[in-house]
Amino acid sequence: AASDVYKRQRSSYFGTIDTAGFPKDAYYVVQAAWLDPKTHPMVHLFPYWDFNDGQLIDLCACTNAHSVELFVNGESLGRKVLDSTKGRTASWQTPYRPGSVKVVAYDENGKVVATDEQDSFDDSAMVCLQADRKTISGDGRELAFITITTRDKNGNPVRNANDRVTVRVNGAGVLVGLDNGDSADPDEYQTDSRRLFSGMLLAVVA
C-alpha cells in the first residue's frame, strides 16, 4: 500500500540530489538558472530514452545557453530560443523510436557550446565501476566512493536498471555500506547487496 511506502521513507523525494549524492534532473535545472553561460555552458536532456514504440514522449532540455535544438536519430525537431523570464527548459513531443536523442545548445552567435545525448538500451549485460580515487590509505578513516552502473550488450548505459548487485571487497579494504538514493528502499545501508535505482548504486569502501 502507498501508506506503507511512506512509512519506510528515509528522506523526502524533493531536492536536487538524492541520499547517494546522485544528481536528479532538478539539479541541472538549477544549474541552468545559475551557471554563467560564458564560463560554464551546459545542457541536460531528460528523461532517459526507453519506452514503447510509438508512445508519445515529452523530451525536455534545460540549458543556460541562448537556444537548444533536439535531434532524434539525426533528424532535427527544431531549435528553440530560451527566454529566461519563462524558465530555462525547452520541450518537444515526439513518438518513441529506438536509437538516440541528442540536444545541442548554441550561444547568441550560433556556436555550439554544449551537447547531451541519450541512447535507447536493452537489458543489463555488464556491470561497470567508477571510483572517485585510485587508492586509499586503508586506515579505516579514508573513504572511496564507487559508482556502480550497468550497460547493455552494446555498451549503452541501462538508465532504469534495478538489478540487485552483491559487493565483495578483497584485500585491506572494508565495505562500509551501499546506497542507491531510493528513499523508499527497505534495505539497510550497511549491507553487501542492494538494487540499483535509476540505474545507479553507490558503494562506500574504507
Report the location of each language-model feature:
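Aromatic sugar-binding surface patches on proteins
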Residues: 83-90, 185-202
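Surface-exposed, short loops/turns at beta-strand junctions within beta-sandwich domains
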Residues: 93-98, 206
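Short, solvent-exposed loop/linker segments at the N-terminal edge
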Residues: 49-55, 135-144
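Short flexible loop/turn segments that cap and initiate beta-strands
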Residues: 64-66, 70-77, 115-117, 143, ...
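Short, small-residue-biased leader/transition segments that mark boundaries at the very start
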Residues: 1-6
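Edge beta-strands of extracellular beta-sandwich domains
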Residues: 110-122
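Beta-strand-rich structural segments
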Residues: 59-62, 104, 141-158
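Aromatic- and carboxylate-lined catalytic core of secreted/periplasmic carbohydrate-active enzymes
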Residues: 11-59, 65
